[in-house]
């Protein structure tokens, strides 16, 4: 029961973590573009 609960939390956190990484990478990329100007 506890293992299934932890598995659900992990599966829920993985997409959030990936989205956070993509957002930070995108913001750094745009910031670099602005600095190039």
From Swiss-Prot:
It is a single-pass membrane protein. InterPro entries: Cyt_6/f_cplx_su5, Cyt_6/f_cplx_su5_sf. Signal peptide: none annotated. The keyword Transmembrane helix applies. The chain crosses the membrane at residues 5-25. One of its GO terms (cellular component) is thylakoid membrane. GO terms for biological process: cytochrome complex assembly; photosynthesis. It comes from the Eukaryota. The keyword Transmembrane applies. Belongs to the PetG family. This is Cytochrome b6-f complex subunit 5. It comes from Cuscuta gronovii. The lineage of its organism: Eukaryota, Viridiplantae, Streptophyta, Embryophyta, Tracheophyta.
